[in-house]
């Protein structure tokens, strides 16, 4: 999502500031992780699916499908916002860091991310 986020931000960015990103949903999350090797994304999904399984007999919130309650739990583990420093007019992220929208539903819908820049 890094490039998509950058394309939507106003230009130029402030020399010094903070970018806050907030996703307005409860079954997806935002994360910063390695963006070079696509295997990281595959491994993260496998790890999360191992930690939080679908169709557990103790889930009570099941009316939206077997993937819904696990999606809410995964969302809570990750969080719905990120804060990224802006330095010299650029997002001050590490070489291998990228912004991820983590979709936890099996078939997620459209998602809205609110971006707020503080100078």
Kindly label every feature range from the protein language model:
Residues 1-119:
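Active-site histidine-anchored catalytic micro-motif
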């Amino acid at each position: 999502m890094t490039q998509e986020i950058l394309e939507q931000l106003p230009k130029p960015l402030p020399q010094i500031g903070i970018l806050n990103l907030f996703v307005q949903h409860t079954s997806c999350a935002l994360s910063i992780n390695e963006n070079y090797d696509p295997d990281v994304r595959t491994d993260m999904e496998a790890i999360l699916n191992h930690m939080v399984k679908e169709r557990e007999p103790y889930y009570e919130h099941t009316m939206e499908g077997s993937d819904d309650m696990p999606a809410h739990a995964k969302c809570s583990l990750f969080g719905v916002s990120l804060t990224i420093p802006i330095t010299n007019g650029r997002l001050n992220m590490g070489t291998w860091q990228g912004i991820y929208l983590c979709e936890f539903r099996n078939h997620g819908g459209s998602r809205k991310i609110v971006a707020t820049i503080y100078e």
